[in-house]
């Protein structure tokens, strides 16, 4: 399988998926990004067993699936061509190449976990503010999220602390 995409798209995939890669060596396939290519698009998925991300970018490839590891990307580039060579994967950045060992195993199934059902409530948040609020609870094992109303945001509750995260207005 051969996948060609813009360098910026590839770099964005690496950045977005890295926090969703498993740190555990028990299931090496969860330390990869699944690239599912069809109809001129690539859906990059990463799952560590607890959280999942899907990220869609344009590409040029035959329909198919390839699992790739996180790699260090060059600082500059215009395009990347990813080639599956049975036991290795080649990343050709035009100015340089990287060849890595292919991780054995069947690609993890990500379809259907993130539903396309119509939501009962939709709330918009500034991701930086949301992260800042959650960072205050990193010492907790569990954080409860209480949603009162889409205009009132939600309340994060820990053992002995709570935080209010206000929403961003969404046009309907």
What does each of the following model-derived ranges do?
Residues 1-172:
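DNA polymerase processivity clamps
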